[in-house]
Amino acid sequence: MGQKINPIGLRLGINRTWDSRWYAGKNEYGRLLHEDVRIRELLHKELKQAAVARIVIERPHKKCRVTIHSARPGVVIGKKGADIDKLRKRVADITSSDVVINIVEIRKPELDATLVAESIAQQLERRVAFRRAMKRAVQSAMRLGAEGIRINCSGRLGGAEIARMEWYREGRVPLHTLRADVDYGVATAFTTFGTCGVKVWIFKGEILEHDPMAQDKRLAGDDNRPRRDAA
């Protein structure tokens, strides 16, 4: 079933963490969940040109900490921080907590599956040939160190009468291996012929127990799992 399930959801608690990290009482869970949805909708709408890949929401005591992962942090911050102050005020209108917004720069957007999918979708909307867009994205990812990448495009590709799916893959993408660091992204292209869906899987390598780089990606309190001895 690793072929069917969302690769990120399958690995939650193993080598990925949740995008919403907070605990709530019985009577507050629904309200906070709706706040998270509205905050994400607002930020994605306001930051369309900022290449936002991920929005993490944490709620320490009486605060709401929003971390925006963007490939173009200058667009988010604005001139002298004016834009981020406006965003903070608009987010504060949604939640009753004190809002803190942090920006994290994505230094290699070619290795982020969400940004790659959105880039291909934008090219399809500009009527770039889908095979050219897919091949360019694959070459860029492999050049920057990805161990494997797969891209699916489906819909009325090139304005064809009959919808179909085309895919391109290079390297290996082990969807069943839980220790594999597989990033997954989805985007939709709104063309004059209808909508086209874009899915991207990027394999960045395996995260092993003895790998010090894996410490940042593991959840706190997850040290009791059996360790794999180095060969």
UniProtKB/Swiss-Prot annotation:
CDD domains: KH-II_30S_S3 (cd02412)
InterPro entries: KH_dom, KH_dom-like_a/b, KH_dom_type_2, KH_sf_prok-type, Ribosomal_S3_C_sf, Ribosomal_uS3_bac-typ, Ribosomal_uS3_C, Ribosomal_uS3_CS
Gene3D superfamilies per record: 3.30.300.20, Ribosomal protein S3, C-terminal domain
GO molecular function: mRNA binding; rRNA binding; structural constituent of ribosome
Gene Ontology BP, a term: translation
Ranges where the KH type-2 domain occurs: 39-107
GO cellular component terms attached to this protein's record: cytosolic small ribosomal subunit
NCBIfam families (alphabetical): rpsC_bact
Quaternary organization: Part of the 30S ribosomal subunit. Forms a tight complex with proteins S10 and S14.
Family affiliation: Belongs to the universal ribosomal protein uS3 family.
Protein name per UniProt: Small ribosomal subunit protein uS3
Originating organism: Nitrobacter hamburgensis (strain DSM 10229 / NCIMB 13809 / X14)
Lineage: Bacteria, Pseudomonadati, Pseudomonadota, Alphaproteobacteria, Hyphomicrobiales
